[in-house]
Amino acid sequence: MRATVPTLDSLQGLALGDAFGDRWFSVSPDEAPAALAARLPRPAPWHWTDDTAMALVLVRHLVHNGEVVQDALAREFAGEYAAEYGRKYGPSMHGVLRDIGAGADWRTVTAQQFGGQGSYGNGAAMRVAPLGAWFSDDLDTVARQAELQALTTHFHPEAVTGAVAVALAAALAARSRGGRPPGRAELLTEVAGRLPDSDVRSGLRTAARLPGHTTVRHAATVLGSGFQISAPDTVPFALWSAAGQLDSLPEALWQTLEGWGDMDTTCAIAAGVVAARTGLTGVPAAWPAAREDLPGWVAEV
């Protein structure tokens, strides 16, 4: 199957956001306020991380299969990890992906994490925006496919719900291409309304109620911005940021960055959602030039 334009746009945006955000980890907290105020991008090169590596696996999987085939996808994630394990994977994912790669059943591996609770990290959410764009014609399918891909690495319901939320937001952004974008509260409320009772849903509802004049720092304080590397601490803020800037990918990235936190992942999520609507329109040419290239197959699908 061929990838849709919104899917590839979302992938390109996600990779740009990932690399853009990750580059700011080299800025000290003392230097950060002035650097952010000046809005000077960090020097090249911008390398992408596990967010993009796993999104690439997911998109290639959809091209080959048309839907999520969990056993195959789990093996493909493990294979990518084995090939480039230095892409800054989260602490728990090293063991998960090594064990799957060694032949263990992904269901057993993921369910054993954290005393049988499973990981509720943001890893399933960080990679999923292109999937939302792929299935954007049917929001029920978006939710189900996002859940299936999440479960291959993350057993905890909050991690799964975070992935579903991001995929739904990307789908709604993709559906709005060429028309009026949904308002921030409108998009966040629509996404939250399709989620099960969870901390992620509560965070999105809180985000939808924040006044229009809310500063980024206040939103990050209220919602969290990934300092805990969890889905509830990451997804509501990233989607709040994206939903307020659906017509400007650069503005979405600068705004998301102001929240600090897990910057590669919050920026990857926000950019993956916004780019499902805008592509890289409006992005300074120097930014994609600074970003590490994606594999050649991306241009062929």
What kind of region is each of these model predictions?
Residues 1-301:
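Structured, active/binding-site neighborhoods that engage oxygen-rich ligands
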